[in-house]
Every structure is written in structure tokens, then in C-alpha cells.
Amino acid sequence: MPKSEIHPKWYPDAKVICNGEVVMTTGSTQPELHVDVWSGNHPFFTGTQKILDTEGRVDRFMKKYGMGSANSSESKDQKEEKDSKK
């Protein structure tokens, strides 16, 4: 026989609240769930996603740490070696 009163109380109509407004209902062990982000206001789901320019960030990193000229000279040397072997 299972023990009585060991399980939490279940709320089948728990309210999910975001920015002071009820956005949905669900089952939970708490009567109200307060969330900061949900699919209705998240940029990924609303289509207002900001895409970062990663190429510009890589170039800025290479320039900052002086790797841009080192990589380009190595690639030229490698090309010359390949051409001389042929």
C-alpha cells in the first residue's frame, strides 16, 4: 500500500505569467509560474533575431593580435613550395 500525503499538490490549471500577463496554462506543482522569456517574445521565435557578422569579428581579432599578416605570408610560402615541387 503506497504512503499517503507524500506527493506534492498538483495544480492542473497552473498559470504561466510573463510580464504581468497570462500567456498559457499548464499542469504544475505550483499555482503560478513566472517566466521572463517565452516563445511569444523570444527573438528566435518571433523572427526578430539579430544575426551577427562573424566575418567582421574574425577580421578584427586577426588585426588586433597581428595574425592577419602572419597567416597570409605562410600561405604564400606554402604556395611557392608547392609550385617548386611540380
From Swiss-Prot:
<dbReference type="InterPro" id="IPR002150">
    <property type="entry name" value="Ribosomal_bL31"/>
</dbReference>
<comment type="similarity">
    <text>Belongs to the bacterial ribosomal protein bL31 family. Type A subfamily.</text>
</comment>
<dbReference type="GO" id="GO:1990904">
    <property type="term" value="C:ribonucleoprotein complex"/>
</dbReference>
<keyword id="KW-0689">Ribosomal protein</keyword>
<dbReference type="GO" id="GO:0019843">
    <property type="term" value="F:rRNA binding"/>
</dbReference>
<dbReference type="GO" id="GO:0005840">
    <property type="term" value="C:ribosome"/>
</dbReference>
<keyword id="KW-0694">RNA-binding</keyword>
<keyword id="KW-0687">Ribonucleoprotein</keyword>
<feature type="region of interest" description="Disordered">
    <location>
        <begin position="64"/>
        <end position="86"/>
    </location>
</feature>
<feature type="compositionally biased region" description="Basic and acidic residues">
    <location>
        <begin position="74"/>
        <end position="86"/>
    </location>
</feature>
<dbReference type="GO" id="GO:0003735">
    <property type="term" value="F:structural constituent of ribosome"/>
</dbReference>
<dbReference type="InterPro" id="IPR034704">
    <property type="entry name" value="Ribosomal_bL28/bL31-like_sf"/>
</dbReference>
<comment type="function">
    <text>Binds the 23S rRNA.</text>
</comment>
<dbReference type="Pfam" id="PF01197">
    <property type="entry name" value="Ribosomal_L31"/>
</dbReference>
<comment type="subunit">
    <text>Part of the 50S ribosomal subunit.</text>
</comment>
<dbReference type="GO" id="GO:0006412">
    <property type="term" value="P:translation"/>
</dbReference>
<dbReference type="InterPro" id="IPR042105">
    <property type="entry name" value="Ribosomal_bL31_sf"/>
</dbReference>
<keyword id="KW-0699">rRNA-binding</keyword>
<protein>
    <recommendedName>
        <fullName>Large ribosomal subunit protein bL31</fullName>
    </recommendedName>
</protein>
<dbReference type="InterPro" id="IPR027491">
    <property type="entry name" value="Ribosomal_bL31_A"/>
</dbReference>
